[in-house]
UniProtKB/Swiss-Prot annotation:
Similarity field: Belongs to the bradykinin family.
Subcellular localization(s) per the UniProt record: Secreted
Superkingdom of origin: Eukaryota
UniProt tissue specificity: Expressed by the skin glands.
Disulfide bonds: none
GO biological process: defense response; positive regulation of muscle contraction; vasodilation
Role description: Induces contraction of intestinal smooth muscle in isolated guinea pig ileum. May induce relaxation of arterial smooth muscle. May target bradykinin receptors (BDKRB). Lacks antibacterial activity against the Gram-positive bacterium S.aureus and the Gram-negative bacteria E.coli and B.dysenteria, and antifungal activity against C.albicans.
Source species taxonomy: Eukaryota, Metazoa, Chordata, Craniata, Vertebrata
Major subcellular site: secreted
Propeptide: 23-43
InterPro entries listed in its UniProt record: Frog_antimicrobial_propeptide
Name assigned to this protein: Ranakinin-N
Length: 58
């Protein structure tokens, strides 16, 4: 029973470290591509005609 608890604790600890490293990498990637994403949003926004609201009920 003790070895099973020890193994589960080790897996939890390693999983937590792995998740934090993934978050750091994702945050760094988001900072890199922030400018590119804004340009994409601007390009997409131009395609919608003025006054168009897709969620308006008749």
């Amino acid at each position: 029973m003790f070895t099973m608890k020890k193994s589960l604790l080790l897996l939890f600890f390693l999983g937590t470290i792995s998740m934090s490293l993934c978050e750091e990498k994702r945050d760094a990637d988001e900072e890199e591509t922030e400018g590119e994403a804004k340009m994409e949003d601007i390009k997409r926004a131009e395609a919608v005609p003025p006054g168009f609201t897709p969620f308006r009920k008749p």
